[in-house]
């Protein structure tokens, strides 16, 4: 797999895809997978491959597990950056998109990649899912902390979301407005 971590583990006693498949909502398999991946990050390719599963539940739970794992271990993002960028650009599944939006600002992006990722996140604002929109708005704000040239466009998007967005988007917009006002530069 392009842009993965380590080699495929020879231990087959745990199947990541099966752990994420077909469980009731209250037992999604994500905590079990997280525990395995934290103990053996070399197996992360198994989790990344689940993003390509034919089962939307597995894709959703894989994205959830990746987002949670890389929040704790951001160093694991670098080897899978290309895969995540491709998945973020190609996925239409809302559950995958909102987790991708949360991960994108944490990727080790080059200055040339930041505008492309910002544009992708901006397109997420047109998603039917309000959760995707909220995560995208937050992600664009987070990207603007890395690239000051995005601060003006982010301020405009945040202000617009406060005026015209769904209630959850307006609430996130208000939170970001307060951060914009408190910020050292006053984004």
Descriptions of predicted regions:
Residues 2-187:
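Alpha-helical scaffold domains
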